[in-house]
Amino acid sequence: MASASSGPSSSVGFSSFDPAVPSCTLSSAASGIKRPMASEVLEARQDSYISLVPYASGMPIKKIGHRSVDSSGETTYKKTTSSALKGAIQLGITHTVGSLSTKPERDVLMQDFYVVESIFFPSEGSNLTPAHHYNDFRFKTYAPVAFRYFRELFGIRPDDYLYSLCSEPLIELCSSGASGSLFYVSSDDEFIIKTVQHKEAEFLQKLLPGYYMNLNQNPRTLLPKFYGLYCVQAGGKNIRIVVMNNLLPRSVKMHIKYDLKGSTYKRRASQKEREKPLPTFKDLDFLQDIPDGLFLDADMYNALCKTLQRDCLVLQSFKIMDYSLLMSIHNIDHAQREPLSSETQYSVDTRRPAPQKALYSTAMESIQGEARRGGTMETDDHMGGIPARNSKGERLLLYIGIIDILQSYRFVKKLEHSWKALVHDGDTVSVHRPGFYAERFQRFMCNTVFKKIPLKPSPSKKFRSGSSFSRRAGSSGNSCITYQPSVSGEHKAQVTTKAEVEPGVHLGRPDVLPQTPPLEEISEGSPIPDPSFSPLVGETLQMLTTSTTLEKLEVAESEFTH
């Protein structure tokens, strides 16, 4: 699952393309968060992968993995310029999607996951390919029929896919992962294209049958949505790319961003990361910034945790580990107070009909299959985000997704965990065996990061009209319901009424409805709640005799038979 990333943004996972945030200081201030001093920050391990070369015109001045940038700002990847790579990608996708549309639709077969189609693009053109001004290249498409099914499952039509990726130039993102990956975002902000290593592409191919089965069973998922896997062969090098959904829309200003694993070992953003326009903070930063966690409606919380549990089970079954939850936060209240200027306006493609956006997956759509609309979160437009609140009561929109899943727990990772565990507590290391990693990941997300707001009972009509409920509860001014966050993770609803000081009145829990025993279990003296009974105050139940119960049953039976 991927997201767009800004200028020099995160080197971990996928970041948000947010040109409106001018500096790290402003980003932190906007979210009301105090940052530690630079001397307290550990340098990220990936800094060791960056090599600086003495300045010379046309020579690379910075290189991370296969990605290098020269003094003129031109990016190359495996000795292929970024502009040539973007052109080759668009030419190849245009051809492969067009040729696939001429083939009749059918069910996906097992062999479809292993098909690789290849076509040569000479610069002078051929009877199948157009002429172009790039060097000759070959374009490979992996499992075209299977990926066509995936796109259809997510509601992406072939012409929409081509329009997004090939109608306008791709936008290169300046950030890269620790391995030096290249990132592109489509002009309409819908898709991310990322270069992947050979092992990652190979692992995705092996993952496809299980991925297909999982999507059939659970189309709503926070896992990355893979839309295509391709390879550009140019200059004797293979450049493999994957097309995914864009997690963070550029049209929404992100105030802060986190990459969370549930680990504490070296899980703090580096000083270099904090200097970026929109830094990607980590687990220790989150625990310091938001110790009380983020509050979601009960339905939303339950749906989110269930989705995380299901996704982690899938990842564990494939022995996948070291994945992260990328979470970007839009603070609605801060955004409403921020002055609008030309710098904060985002240029997104408006020529496309607005309803088209609904065809693509968002964080909200990934879990809303089980979450009911509405609740205590009052936002007119979620813009694809999950509504939440912080401990101050500020309204938030969360954009989340699981990223970095194309890694399996193999020998290298086992070795990495072994030597780390010799020096540090093994349970705090992020590289862990898949089963333990999944359990720790879920526990951290559902107990520390996300918290449940207790359900607020809807007042009955009698309560609104000031009838019997008001008389039982006393003065309406003496009754309120609040929730208070706690670092321990316990969040209880507090009901304050005059009944608290009146003996013999049991308040009960306002967020739980009393269970009425089945009729066949009712014996003499068993309490049966009256239809006008309100669970808020815990009014003493009326005691009905057996004769009254039988009388009601006879009336109900006569009404049913007639």
From Swiss-Prot:
SUPFAM superfamilies: SAICAR synthase-like (SSF56104). InterPro entries: PInositol-4-P-4/5-kinase_C_sf, PInositol-4-P-4/5-kinase_core, PInositol-4-P-5-kinase_N, PInositol-4/5-P-5/4-kinase. Transmembrane segments: none annotated. One of its GO terms (biological process) is glycerophospholipid metabolic process. Keywords: ATP-binding, Cell membrane, Cell projection, Cytoplasm, Isopeptide bond, Kinase, Lipid metabolism, Membrane, Nucleotide-binding, Nucleus, Phosphoprotein, Transferase, Ubl conjugation. Residues 81-449 form the PIPK domain. Activated by diarachidonoyl phosphatidic acid (DAPA), when 1,2-dipalmitoyl-PI4P is used as a substrate. Highly expressed in heart, placenta, skeletal muscle, kidney and pancreas. Detected at lower levels in brain, lung and liver. The modification Phosphoserine is found at S486. It catalyses: a 1,2-diacyl-sn-glycero-3-phospho-(1D-myo-inositol 4-phosphate) + ATP = a 1,2-diacyl-sn-glycero-3-phospho-(1D-myo-inositol-4,5-bisphosphate) + ADP + H(+); 1-octadecanoyl-2-(5Z,8Z,11Z,14Z)-eicosatetraenoyl-sn-glycero-3-phospho-1D-myo-inositol 4-phosphate + ATP = 1-octadecanoyl-2-(5Z,8Z,11Z,14Z)-eicosatetraenoyl-sn-glycero-3-phospho-1D-myo-inositol 4,5-bisphosphate + ADP + H(+); 1,2-dihexadecanoyl-sn-glycero-3-phospho-(1D-myo-inositol-4-phosphate) + ATP = 1,2-dihexadecanoyl-sn-glycero-3-phospho-(1D-myo-inositol-4,5-bisphosphate) + ADP + H(+); 1-octadecanoyl-2-(9Z)-octadecenoyl-sn-glycero-3-phospho-1D-myo-inositol 4-phosphate + ATP = 1-octadecanoyl-2-(9Z)-octadecenoyl-sn-glycero-3-phospho-1D-myo-inositol 4,5-bisphosphate + ADP + H(+). This is Phosphatidylinositol 4-phosphate 5-kinase type-1 alpha. The lineage of its organism: Eukaryota, Metazoa, Chordata, Craniata, Vertebrata. The gene is PIP5K1A.
